[in-house]
């Protein structure tokens, strides 16, 4: 976790306008949107770190915090994998290619990829929780030789909920071993059944003290993932989660996203587990 | 610069000087049976001869036996209504042929002189400065207003039953953060300048150096405020106390009394939570993004697509109190409470946070 | 044939004030008429286009067997049914009959009570049919009505705040009349929507937008009792336009029982 990349100057409420350059349907109710800045200077300046998010703004409808799913080295188009859930994402889903919207960002903390160098890395993703981890996968693949054993454990409610399946073969070939599992099986499913935590329990860990685990998914899944990892001997300081809260400003000024002493928008969304653990599973905090 | 003396009859000259410098004067005035902050034109608008009597859940305006200008403490308003307005436009968006044109609103042209800012309120402004100006991101709305304001502080010479600034080390003496600070005596004010702008204004007023007797009278007047404070919040170890007692039975106890009505957060001079909404015409071609005061006591405040995080009064009261007194320290290096007592007075059912903290210090049954 | 959504306005037991709010939306009415086909709105025009309708705005409570049948027909004819106003969402002021003997009222008011067919209660639409959205208030707020219509035209969920009235008093700078004057005020437990009008005009909120979510009415009532206000003053305050909502009813019933016990 590092300090925000964005400068302290300027008006944090101002949006850039971006145009939808491409829409790729993923799973039911989920699509990946590639955005291009209408202002080339803004495009040249824009950089993000894996785990960070943007505020996407549809005038008259509102803003939504959406994590980046793009390649960290992207320079022209930035993809966001978005599930239709609220008013903003519903309205976004009605826009086609060429549609224009507002964007502020990037905001928040990022996955500690540099701390993963020389280590084994496990990614545990539940459902659409894989979206903010995809930039990590891209980065690990791009610098494969710098890391040890790389594993992605991806769980979903049903086979139709597994994300980016068309890329899994490439990831496997590139050296990230992908394992998938589903809560509820289906007629054509021959794979694992159970939660991603079950996959983690079975995963051989040759050197737990030198393994980093990054997880994103429902709170309860991340909780049990962290518990399983601790039981397997991973230090709490090498577990990282990505939290979610109501966000309105994204810059620590509106108060909505607090989780104990943390502002999820600024201190998170990516937290080292030992920092957030005292507050993470307190009911209603 | 030595303490100076301003005759009461010359207070209007200070107001005229500030008006002449382009400041709009805002200060205490009687309205709706309370002392509120509003625009004032002259010393005649001040609540001269009035005082307030406060208790948990109760505020009464009463006449004084003397003609004091500042013989009361703090009311339902705070200066945040000028620095962090209850409603502000963040951005406008207009539909164009190719998409949207988005603009920041123009910066305000007015500048305010705050008249009668108390020590706890100076502390509150400092707390909000830390939030809005000194973090990674600066709030442009707050900054534009804060940069331009002139502060005339007033030392309290009495205390309400709800005051506890001495527990929070924020008062009652105004130490810093003002341009001018006044201490009211029977016929004059002792004036201290706290900034270059303050010293400049002093140079344009008919002031003379205060005599030792006058300085002693001011000291005695200020001491009355200290002596009048009866409420106490024990702050020793308060951060750990609250954050390690998140399941204390007292939270359910206070939740049975708390209305979750948000009054405490609205009157609090440091609470800074807000929500952003869209205001559009029916066609949706012109849009304004508006920020409004909001509160962690509202159900929707923590709503996500998956549901509401703090879905009962217990969790919301706990959020407010732990944030104000404990996690604020983690976030901003200081307490979010300045001991002004507004949340106690203006709670419709008389909940007193100092009593809640005291109860949290007791182990549950 | 128009492809604009078809809007119908229906009335049950009510004063017509909420429907009039639609006519009162003068600045927006032309835009509304442009965006919707107003197929049935007897308060404005005798033209009635038969159903089905895309949106029905329904005012009034259910007080007669005929009402109870007719609201089911309205539901059958309407894709999206919006209950507007305290009568439609809570039974209205006429729900005071729910605490009394309606036959007694009939005998007192009508020369031939046997001509009158009525139910013993006045109840909200949602007690009879599925309601898609409830717009509270007595009367409803014009701005909120326009928001509901704009949202339906845009195909999104209406944005109507559900916090308490106190937030709005504080935002507009109104001094709390409960704390500063000891006036019993329902603001802390009442849903906003009016813009906090009454306290700004020196009177307590009388709850016309109904209970706020998770309203702690019992604690507020206890505080008043401790402060010297008697149940005789509090029961009528709670039994008002939204008196028959469960939150207000439970506490007024408790206070009434206390009053009866002391008499």
Predicted regions and their residues:
Chain B
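A donor-sugar binding/catalytic signature common to diverse glycosyltransferases
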Residues: 263-279
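Iron-sulfur-associated redox domains of electron-transfer enzymes in respiratory
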Residues: 1-243, 249-251, 271, 282
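Residue-level detector of anion-binding/catalytic polar loops
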Residues: 24, 264, 343
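Extended amphipathic alpha-helical segments enriched in small hydrophobics
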Residues: 255-265
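A generic structural-conservation signal
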Residues: 27, 267-268, 346
């Amino acid at each position: 976790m590092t300090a925000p990349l964005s400068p302290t100057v300027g008006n944090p409420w101002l949006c850039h306008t971006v145009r939808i350059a491409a829409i790729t349907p993923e799973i039911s109710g989920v699509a990946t949107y590639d955005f291009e800045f209408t202002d080339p200077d803004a495009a040249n300046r824009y950089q993000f770190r894996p785990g960070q998010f943007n505020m996407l703004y549809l005038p008259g409808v509102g803003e939504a915090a959406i994590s980046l799913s793009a390649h960290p080295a992207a320079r022209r188009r930035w993809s966001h994998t978005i599930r239709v859930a609220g008013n903003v994402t519903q309205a976004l889903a009605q826009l086609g290619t060429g549609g224009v919207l507002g964007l502020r960002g990037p905001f928040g903390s990022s996955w500690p990829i540099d701390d993963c160098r020389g280590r084994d890395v496990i990614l545990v993703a539940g459902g659409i929780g894989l979206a903010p981890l995809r930039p990590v996968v891209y980065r690990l693949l791009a610098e494969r030789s710098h890391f040890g054993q790389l594993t992605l454990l991806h769980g979903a409610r049903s086979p139709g909920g597994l994300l980016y399946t068309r890329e899994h073969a490439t990831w496997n070939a590139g050296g990230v071993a992908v394992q998938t599992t589903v809560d509820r099986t289906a007629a054509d499913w021959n794979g694992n059944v159970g939660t991603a935590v079950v996959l983690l329990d079975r995963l051989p860990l040759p050197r737990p003290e030198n393994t980093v685990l990054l997880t994103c998914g429902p709170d309860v899944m991340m909780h049990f993932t962290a518990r399983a990892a601790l039981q397997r001997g991973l230090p709490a300081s090498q577990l990282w989660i990505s939290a979610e809260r109501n966000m309105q400003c994204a810059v620590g000024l509106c108060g909505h996203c607090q989780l104990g002493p943390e502002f999820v928008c600024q201190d998170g969304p990516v937290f080292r587990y030992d920092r957030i653990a005292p507050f993470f599973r307190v009911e209603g905090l | 610069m030595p303490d100076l003396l301003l005759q009461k009859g010359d207070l209007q000259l200070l107001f005229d000087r500030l008006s002449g410098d382009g400041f709009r004067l805002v200060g205490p005035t009687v309205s709706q049976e309370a002392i509120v902050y509003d625009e004032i034109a002259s010393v005649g608008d001040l609540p001269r001869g009035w005082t307030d009597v406060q208790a948990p859940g109760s505020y009464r305006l009463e006449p004084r036996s003397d003609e004091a200008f500042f013989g009361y403490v703090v009311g339902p308003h705070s200066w945040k209504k000028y620095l962090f307005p209850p409603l502000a436009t963040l951005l406008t968006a207009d539909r164009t042929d190719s998409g949207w044109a988005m603009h920041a609103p123009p910066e305000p042209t007015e500048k305010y002189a705050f008249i009668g800012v108390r020590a706890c309120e100076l502390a509150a402004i400092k707390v909000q400065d830390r939030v809005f100006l000194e973090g990674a991101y600066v709030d442009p709305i707050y900054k534009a207003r804060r940069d331009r304001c002139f502060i005339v502080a007033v030392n309290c010479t009495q205390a309400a039953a709800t005051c506890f600034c001495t527990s929070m080390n924020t008062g009652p003496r105004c130490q810093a953060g003002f341009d001018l600070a006044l201490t009211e005596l029977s016929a004059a004010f002792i004036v201290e300048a706290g900034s270059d702008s303050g010293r400049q204004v002093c140079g344009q007023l008919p002031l003379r150096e205060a005599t030792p007797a006058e300085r002693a009278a001011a000291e005695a007047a200020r001491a009355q405020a200290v002596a009048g404070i009866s409420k106490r919040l024990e702050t020793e170890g308060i951060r750990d106390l609250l954050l390690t007692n998140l399941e204390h039975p007292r939270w359910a106890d206070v939740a049975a009394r708390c209305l979750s009505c948000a009054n405490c957060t609205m009157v609090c001079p440091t609470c800074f939570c807000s929500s952003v909404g869209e205001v559009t015409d029916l066609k949706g071609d012109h849009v304004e993004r508006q920020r409004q005061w909001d509160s962690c006591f509202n159900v929707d405040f923590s709503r996500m697509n998956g549901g509401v995080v703090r879905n009962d009064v217990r969790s919301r009261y706990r959020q407010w109190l732990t944030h104000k007194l404990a996690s604020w320290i983690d976030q901003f290096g200081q307490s979010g409470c300045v001991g002004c007592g507004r949340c106690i007075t203006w709670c419709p059912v008389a909940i007193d946070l100092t009593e809640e903290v005291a109860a949290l210090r007791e182990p549950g049954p | 044939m128009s492809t604009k959504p078809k809007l119908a306005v229906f009335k049950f037991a009510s004063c017509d004030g909420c429907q009039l709010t639609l006519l009162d939306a003068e600045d927006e009415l032309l835009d509304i008429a442009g965006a919707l086909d107003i197929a049935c709105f007897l308060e404005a025009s005798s033209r009635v286009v038969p159903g089905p309708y895309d949106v029905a705005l329904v005012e009034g409570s259910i007080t007669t067997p005929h009402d109870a049948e007719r609201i089911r027909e309205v539901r059958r004819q309407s894709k999206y049914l919006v209950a507007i106003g305290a009568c439609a969402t809570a039974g209205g002021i006429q729900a005071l009959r729910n605490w009394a003997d309606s036959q007694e009222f009939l005998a007192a008011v009508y020369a031939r009570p046997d001509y009158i067919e009525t139910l013993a209660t006045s109840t909200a639409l949602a007690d009879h049919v599925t309601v898609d959205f409830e717009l509270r208030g007595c009367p409803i707020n014009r701005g909120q009505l326009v928001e509901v219509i704009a949202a339906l035209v845009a195909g999104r969920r209406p944005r109507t705040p559900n916090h308490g009235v106190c937030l709005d008093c504080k935002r507009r700078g109104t001094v709390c009349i409960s704390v500063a004057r000891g006036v019993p005020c329902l603001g802390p437990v009442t849903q906003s929507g009016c813009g906090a009008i009454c306290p700004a005009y020196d009177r307590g909120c009388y709850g016309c937008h109904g209970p706020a979510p998770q309203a702690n009415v019992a604690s507020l009532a206890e505080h008043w009792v401790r402060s010297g206000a008697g149940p005789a003053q509090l029961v009528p305050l709670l039994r008002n336009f939204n008196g028959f909502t469960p939150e207000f009813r439970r506490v007024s019933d408790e206070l009434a029982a206390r009053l009866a016990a002391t008499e």
